[in-house]
Amino acid sequence: MSAYLSNYWVLYRKYVELFDKLRYKGIPLGLISNFYQYISPELRVMMEEEPELFGSVDQHIDEGQIQPFFEERIQNIVKTNDEPVKGKVILHFDYLRFSNENYYQFDPEKTAVLARWSLPHYCDLPVISKREIADSCQKGDSKQYLETACSLLAPYDDHPAFGDQAFRDRLFKDIPLFIEAIDTVDALFEQEKISAVIVGTAEDIYSRVLALMCQRKGAVSICLQHGALMGDEAFIPVFTTYQAVFGAYEAEWFIRKGCKPEQILVTGHPRFDQIFNRTPMDMSIFYRKLAFQPTKKIVLIATQPFSEDFYSGVLQGLSDQKQLQIIIKPHPWEIGKNKLDLYHEAAKKHQACRVIKKELELYDLLPYVDAAVTQTSTVGLEAMLFQKPVLIGKSSGNRSYPYYESLGDFMFDQPDELAHTLVEVLRSPDVHQKAEEARLAFIAANYPVAESTNALFAELKAKTGVDYRREDTE
């Protein structure tokens, strides 16, 4: 474990212990904080450089004790002893990342979409507006909780984290939001008979409150895996009854962090189902939109922020490959920040290179490319599910992200080596076959479920006794 993460878990544990008795409607407010967002860039540097910033090594948390520490506190939430009901499943819209087709497969009589906005229906499912419930429900006063938080932090004025004004400001800003979310979700459970809740992440306030309220009310909660598992803070601890994952890599990772095997469900993610059943864009339209030639090979490069040197090296390595046509798909963060100069410069130098922001969807591109390049993005997985060879660049930085390491010879430290091998994959049948074998082995282990929505329905029925599938979609 890195110095930063060792410090992080010691600090997080101390925070949860300090705020354990600050509870509203039985829920500890300290568990709702998305804690890593409280850590300033300056404090992060200190945590990386000073391994014992928050205590000696003997105070560090063993990797396998991370989830048990939080699980004990989650299980200690006092239950309301409500009788189990065969009620609805609530789909929390934020971060769920379902396709429309995913929503249409749920039974409207047994399902509701919980969203920030207000509409009568979404994909034929009734919508429950968080804002409307929040406006109409009885509201708690956050003032006393803010005062208690201030008094709890008062002895820590000189503490590197708890004494940091930015840390305190973020917490004090969040506490009224915690109270509102608890009131809203509590009112939701009073309004509806709920057997299960599905969330797309446990990072945001409402998803976490939904999970903790399910624990209090005796309902089932499932958190889907929202992306490639590339960092502890966004995925652990698990707050839901069950954590759904893509495959074996994530299942083993969560178990190493102390999750119980029965807490992990290998379901894939419903949004990937469209890879197997979506009708692709017409081929002639694809080539016309990009002004590409059908006789030449196409490479997709899906970029990642803060990796300009790596992608620059790959593009430089391909600059003399006139037989290749290149699609650069920048990361959404790069598009939002307009960090695209490197890619536009590359497009000028290469006769057939296109920078695609939002003009075409990823799933319009992947059926027609011959290979894909990325680093830590789920695009690597998605391209492999589209049966394309994938080459992975190792990300820079002081953290290791081994998700794609089982690809072996098709994961690279150096961009020039990746570019060279990419050309060989497209030129040599033998090298292409090796890439295909690596792809097949990766998918067999790390995404074995081709029909994720069906797997999710099966798990929901097993856990609640209710079949939530829309009858006419069977």
UniProtKB/Swiss-Prot annotation:
It holds the Pfam family Glyphos_transf. GO terms for molecular function: CDP-glycerol glycerophosphotransferase activity. GO terms for cellular component: membrane. Pathway: Spore coat biogenesis; spore coat polysaccharide biosynthesis. InterPro entries: Glycerophosphate_synth, TagF_C. This is Spore coat polysaccharide biosynthesis protein SpsB. The lineage of its organism: Bacteria, Bacillati, Bacillota, Bacilli, Bacillales.
